[in-house]
């Protein structure tokens, strides 16, 4: 892995699956983040077939929600990145993370993909693992055989509240990230939030 890029991102990608059947499922946490980011940016989102996804723009920054289904996300990311000459290190991918409890975040550059099929395909299309990832915790079902069923179901109410709170915290990182202050953003993202609601429930 190369040293982390400190350049602000030119492309923010939210991962998920298209269609109403998947809108409220855990695997769509990246889409949820981008929906809130589009509101914050005041950006209009439109489907662009050449990029295989829904695209928004804010100044010189792009947002992409691939509409290819999760395991082909790289097709969309690669197409937009090549067209606009965006380097992998200038890309931030926002996705759900099984190994983190609901309500928590992790920001990191490069590294492994943790079995996430969306990241695997993006890495294959970019030819490198060296891009930024913002991981939104959705928790783990406890049994590997239950993972597919788990990520394709909606969170419980208390989990949804924690995930929504984490997304708001993630939006709060953007002023740092947009200035290239990745170290400060990483420290803030990776710090444990105070008293997540789901942990207070007996």
Curated annotation (Swiss-Prot):
The gene is pth. TRNA binds at residues 22, 69, 71, 117. Keywords: Cytoplasm, Hydrolase, RNA-binding, tRNA-binding. GO terms for molecular function: peptidyl-tRNA hydrolase activity; tRNA binding. Hydrolyzes ribosome-free peptidyl-tRNAs (with 1 or more amino acids incorporated), which drop off the ribosome during protein synthesis, or as a result of ribosome stalling. The keyword Cytoplasm applies. This is Peptidyl-tRNA hydrolase. It comes from the Bacteria. It is found in: Cytoplasm. It comes from Thiobacillus denitrificans (strain ATCC 25259 / T1). GO terms for biological process: protein quality control for misfolded or incompletely synthesized proteins; rescue of stalled ribosome. Monomer. Gene3D superfamilies: Peptidyl-tRNA hydrolase (3.40.50.1470). The record marks 17 as: Discriminates between blocked and unblocked aminoacyl-tRNA. Belongs to the PTH family. The record marks 96 as: Stabilizes the basic form of H active site to accept a proton. Its EC number is 3.1.1.29. PANTHER family: PEPTIDYL-TRNA HYDROLASE. It is an enzyme of class 3 (hydrolase). Pfam families: Pept_tRNA_hydro. Transmembrane segments: none annotated. The active site is at residue 27. It catalyses: an N-acyl-L-alpha-aminoacyl-tRNA + H2O = an N-acyl-L-amino acid + a tRNA + H(+). GO terms for cellular component: cytoplasm. InterPro entries: Pept_tRNA_hydro (IPR001328), Pept_tRNA_hydro_CS (IPR018171), Pept_tRNA_hydro_sf (IPR036416).
């Amino acid at each position: 892995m190369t040293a982390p890029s400190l350049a602000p991102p030119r492309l923010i990608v939210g991962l998920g699956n298209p269609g109403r059947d998947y809108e409220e499922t855990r695997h769509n946490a990246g889409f949820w983040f981008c929906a809130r980011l589009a509101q914050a940016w005041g950006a209009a989102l439109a489907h662009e077939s050449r990029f295989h996804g829904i695209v928004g723009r804010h100044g010189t920054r792009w947002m992409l929600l691939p509409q290819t289904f999760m395991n082909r996300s790289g097709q969309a990311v690669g197409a937009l990145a090549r067209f606009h000459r965006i380097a992998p290190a200038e890309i931030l991918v926002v996705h759900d993370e099984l190994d983190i409890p609901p309500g928590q975040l992790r920001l990191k550059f490069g590294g492994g993909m943790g079995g996430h099929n969306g990241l695997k395909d993006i890495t294959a299309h970019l030819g490198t693992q060296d891009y930024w990832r913002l991981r939104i915790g959705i928790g783990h079902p406890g049994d590997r055989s239950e993972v597919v069923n788990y990520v394709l179901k909606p969170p419980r109410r208390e989990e949804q509240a924690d995930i929504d709170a984490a997304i708001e915290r993630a939006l709060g990182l953007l002023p740092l990230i947009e200035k290239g202050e990745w170290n400060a953003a990483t420290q803030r993202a990776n710090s444990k939030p105070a008293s997540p609601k789901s942990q207070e429930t007996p």
